Protein backbone atom coordinates (compact mmCIF):
# COMPACT_ATOMS: atom_id res chain seq x y z
CA UNK A 1 0.00 0.00 0.00
CA UNK A 2 1.11 3.52 -0.75
CA UNK A 3 1.01 6.57 1.53
CA UNK A 4 -1.83 8.02 -0.57
CA UNK A 5 -4.14 5.46 1.11
CA UNK A 6 -3.40 6.30 4.71
CA UNK A 7 -2.93 9.99 5.21
CA UNK A 8 -4.12 13.44 4.40
CA UNK A 9 -2.12 14.43 1.36
CA UNK A 10 -0.20 17.67 1.68
CA UNK A 11 0.97 19.90 -1.12
CA UNK A 12 4.57 19.01 -0.25
CA UNK A 13 3.79 15.30 -0.61
CA UNK A 14 2.17 15.95 -3.99
CA UNK A 15 5.18 17.96 -5.14
CA UNK A 16 7.44 15.02 -4.22
CA UNK A 17 5.47 12.89 -6.70
CA UNK A 18 5.66 15.27 -9.68
CA UNK A 19 7.04 13.42 -12.69
CA UNK A 20 6.08 10.02 -11.30
CA UNK A 21 3.40 7.58 -12.42
CA UNK A 22 0.59 7.46 -9.85
CA UNK A 23 -0.72 3.91 -9.64
CA UNK A 24 -1.38 3.40 -5.92
CA UNK A 25 -3.79 6.21 -5.07
CA UNK A 26 -7.23 5.95 -3.48
CA UNK A 27 -8.77 6.01 -6.97
CA UNK A 28 -8.85 2.60 -8.70
CA UNK A 29 -9.95 4.27 -11.96
CA UNK A 30 -7.12 6.78 -11.68
CA UNK A 31 -4.64 3.99 -10.99
CA UNK A 32 -5.84 2.21 -14.13
CA UNK A 33 -5.06 5.33 -16.18
CA UNK A 34 -1.39 5.10 -15.13
CA UNK A 35 -1.30 8.89 -15.05
CA UNK A 36 1.80 10.96 -14.40
CA UNK A 37 1.47 13.92 -12.07
CA UNK A 38 3.07 16.52 -14.34
CA UNK A 39 2.78 19.62 -12.14
CA UNK A 40 1.01 20.76 -8.99
CA UNK A 41 0.54 23.92 -6.98
CA UNK A 42 -2.23 25.03 -4.65
CA UNK A 43 -5.48 24.82 -6.62
CA UNK A 44 -3.85 23.59 -9.82
CA UNK A 45 -2.73 20.22 -11.14
CA UNK A 46 -1.59 18.80 -14.46
CA UNK A 47 -1.63 15.12 -15.31
CA UNK A 48 -0.34 13.32 -18.39
CA UNK A 49 -1.77 10.10 -19.76
CA UNK A 50 -0.69 7.89 -22.66
CA UNK A 51 -3.73 6.99 -24.80
CA UNK A 52 -3.72 3.18 -24.82
CA UNK A 53 -5.69 0.89 -27.15
CA UNK A 54 -8.19 -0.06 -24.45
CA UNK A 55 -9.04 3.67 -24.05
CA UNK A 56 -10.03 4.09 -27.69
CA UNK A 57 -13.25 4.11 -29.65
CA UNK A 58 -13.66 1.99 -32.83
CA UNK A 59 -11.90 4.72 -34.84
CA UNK A 60 -8.69 4.48 -32.81
CA UNK A 61 -9.13 7.75 -30.90
CA UNK A 62 -9.63 8.29 -27.19
CA UNK A 63 -13.21 7.50 -26.20
CA UNK A 64 -15.20 10.46 -24.87
CA UNK A 65 -15.82 8.63 -21.61
CA UNK A 66 -12.09 8.08 -21.19
CA UNK A 67 -11.40 11.76 -21.88
CA UNK A 68 -13.97 12.58 -19.20
CA UNK A 69 -12.21 10.22 -16.78
CA UNK A 70 -8.88 11.96 -17.42
CA UNK A 71 -10.55 15.33 -16.82
CA UNK A 72 -12.20 14.13 -13.62
CA UNK A 73 -8.88 12.77 -12.32
CA UNK A 74 -7.13 16.07 -13.05
CA UNK A 75 -9.83 17.87 -11.07
CA UNK A 76 -9.33 15.39 -8.24
CA UNK A 77 -5.62 16.18 -8.01
CA UNK A 78 -6.32 19.92 -8.07
CA UNK A 79 -8.82 19.43 -5.22
CA UNK A 80 -6.26 17.40 -3.26
CA UNK A 81 -3.79 20.27 -3.63
CA UNK A 82 -6.16 22.46 -1.59
CA UNK A 83 -5.37 20.29 1.46
CA UNK A 84 -9.06 20.12 2.36
CA UNK A 85 -10.27 18.39 5.51
CA UNK A 86 -13.16 16.58 3.77
CA UNK A 87 -13.75 14.76 0.50
CA UNK A 88 -15.54 16.38 -2.45
CA UNK A 89 -17.83 14.75 -5.00
CA UNK A 90 -18.89 15.96 -8.44
CA UNK A 91 -22.23 17.68 -8.94
CA UNK A 92 -21.70 17.97 -12.70
CA UNK A 93 -19.08 17.71 -15.41
CA UNK A 94 -19.53 19.55 -18.70
CA UNK A 95 -17.08 18.67 -21.46
CA UNK A 96 -16.55 20.21 -24.89
CA UNK A 97 -14.72 17.75 -27.14
CA UNK A 98 -12.78 19.77 -29.72
CA UNK A 99 -10.31 17.35 -31.33
CA UNK A 100 -9.54 13.65 -31.08
CA UNK A 101 -6.35 12.11 -29.71
CA UNK A 102 -5.17 8.89 -31.38
CA UNK A 103 -3.80 5.80 -29.69
CA UNK A 104 -0.18 6.40 -28.71
CA UNK A 105 -0.63 10.13 -28.07
CA UNK A 106 0.20 11.55 -24.66
CA UNK A 107 -2.43 13.98 -23.47
CA UNK A 108 -2.09 16.49 -20.64
CA UNK A 109 -5.02 17.72 -18.57
CA UNK A 110 -4.50 21.02 -16.75
CA UNK A 111 -7.00 21.60 -13.93
CA UNK A 112 -7.56 24.88 -12.15
CA UNK A 113 -9.77 25.56 -9.15
CA UNK A 114 -11.51 28.78 -10.17
CA UNK A 115 -13.52 29.28 -6.99
CA UNK A 116 -13.52 27.57 -3.63
CA UNK A 117 -16.57 28.38 -1.55
CA UNK A 118 -17.58 26.96 1.83
CA UNK A 119 -19.41 24.01 0.24
CA UNK A 120 -18.91 24.22 -3.53
CA UNK A 121 -15.77 24.24 -5.66
CA UNK A 122 -15.76 25.25 -9.33
CA UNK A 123 -13.00 23.79 -11.50
CA UNK A 124 -12.00 24.18 -15.13
CA UNK A 125 -9.80 21.87 -17.20
CA UNK A 126 -8.08 22.12 -20.57
CA UNK A 127 -6.69 18.99 -22.24
CA UNK A 128 -3.85 19.25 -24.76
CA UNK A 129 -1.95 16.87 -27.02
CA UNK A 130 1.85 16.86 -27.40
CA UNK A 131 1.61 19.68 -29.99
CA UNK A 132 -0.36 21.84 -27.52
CA UNK A 133 -3.59 21.49 -29.53
CA UNK A 134 -6.57 22.06 -27.24
CA UNK A 135 -8.45 18.73 -27.40
CA UNK A 136 -11.14 19.34 -24.80
CA UNK A 137 -12.23 21.86 -22.23
CA UNK A 138 -14.40 21.19 -19.23
CA UNK A 139 -15.99 22.72 -16.17
CA UNK A 140 -17.22 21.02 -13.03
CA UNK A 141 -18.85 21.91 -9.74
CA UNK A 142 -18.08 19.76 -6.72
CA UNK A 143 -19.59 19.70 -3.24
CA UNK A 144 -17.94 18.93 0.06
CA UNK A 145 -19.25 15.60 1.38
CA UNK A 146 -18.51 15.98 5.06
CA UNK A 147 -16.58 12.68 4.97
CA UNK A 148 -13.31 13.50 6.71
CA UNK A 149 -10.00 12.67 5.09
CA UNK A 150 -7.95 10.18 7.09
CA UNK A 151 -5.03 11.91 8.77
CA UNK A 152 -2.39 9.62 10.19
Residue spans for each PLM region:
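Terminal targeting signals and extreme-terminal segments of soluble enzymes
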Residues: 2-152
Amino acid sequence: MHVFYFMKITLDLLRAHVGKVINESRSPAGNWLQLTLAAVEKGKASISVLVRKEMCNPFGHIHGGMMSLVIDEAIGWAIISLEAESHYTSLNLNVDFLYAAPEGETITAVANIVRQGKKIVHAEVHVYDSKQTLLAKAASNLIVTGMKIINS
